[in-house]
């Protein structure tokens, strides 16, 4: 089984149609030896300054250069501070399940730095060790499947 991950659901649906992954599931499409899942923008972000021991953050605190940067699920405002976005947590769980069932991953996020970052943050956050290849060009079967 091969996983494909896109930056947004609309692209995932287009790719799934092209490769014959027509079975709809919660958070992904499957079929014909493929599982196609998606992010919806930046699901993972760098931790806030407080996570690195910087209290009462001010401009004078910059730059913040911790020994290791922490990746966390996208945050939303809560009553007191911020909390992980429940929709993001759900999709991350589904992406992990897809990755766990597959032998390799084809990255079909948008071309450029942002698309690359969206995938790599997810990949590292999930501690995934599967091999992956990047397909950034056109929505044609040979380029999607890296044939």
Predicted regions mapped to residue ranges:
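Single conserved hydrophobic/aromatic residue that forms the stacking wall/gate
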Residues: 138-147
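Intrinsically disordered, low-complexity regulatory segments
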Residues: 1-139
């Amino acid at each position: 089984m091969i996983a494909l991950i896109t930056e947004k659901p609309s692209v995932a649906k287009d790719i799934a149609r092209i490769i014959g992954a027509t079975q709809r599931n919660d958070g992904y499409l499957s079929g014909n030896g493929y599982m196609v899942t998606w992010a919806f923008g930046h699901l993972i972000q760098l931790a806030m300054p407080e996570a690195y021991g910087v209290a009462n953050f001010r401009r004078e605190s910059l730059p913040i250069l911790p020994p290791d940067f922490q990746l966390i699920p996208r945050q939303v405002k809560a009553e007191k501070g911020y909390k992980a976005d429940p929709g993001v947590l759900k999709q991350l769980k589904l992406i992990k399940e897809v990755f766990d069932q597959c032998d390799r991953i084809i990255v079909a996020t948008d071309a450029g730095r942002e698309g690359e970052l969206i995938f790599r943050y997810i990949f590292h956050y999930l501690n995934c060790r599967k091999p992956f290849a990047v397909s950034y060009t056109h929505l044609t079967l040979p380029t999607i499947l890296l044939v």
